[in-house]
Amino acid sequence: MWIYGPSGVGKSTYARATYPNAFHKTQGKWWDGYIGQENVILDDLDSDCLAHHLKIWCDHYACSGESKGGTIPLLHRNFVVTSNYSIDQIFEKHDAEKIAAIKRRFKVIHMTAPFKKQETEELVDELSV
């Protein structure tokens, strides 16, 4: 899931409310501290440096993540990115094929106004289908 929109609309709050026990991924390739959580949140992505990794981490195939001293299996089912930028905006310097590959891996939510709890529950139900 890719949640984007202006600052202050509750993107991070929405992600944390939807996946309260998620692993909070840093903006780098390292997965230190990950212990098999089903949900991962990459909050406030603001650079295109992870394009290659996102294609791997957000695909439906099994993959590994790098931790200091080795690799670990990534067992997540849901990967959430929050950003002020859309996929097109953040990866504008990449070729169309790479952007399309990233878009295929995400359900996109454009938040333009603060969300309400009921709307969040309805959206979670819709995305679970």
Name each region found by the language model.
Residues 8, 26-30, 84-86:
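Short, polar loop motifs at secondary-structure junctions
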Residues 14:
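Hydrophobic positions on the alpha1 helix immediately C-terminal to the Walker A/P-loop
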Residues 1:
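Conserved beta-strand position immediately N-terminal to the Walker
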Residues 21-53:
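AAA+/P-loop NTPase substrate/partner-engagement loops
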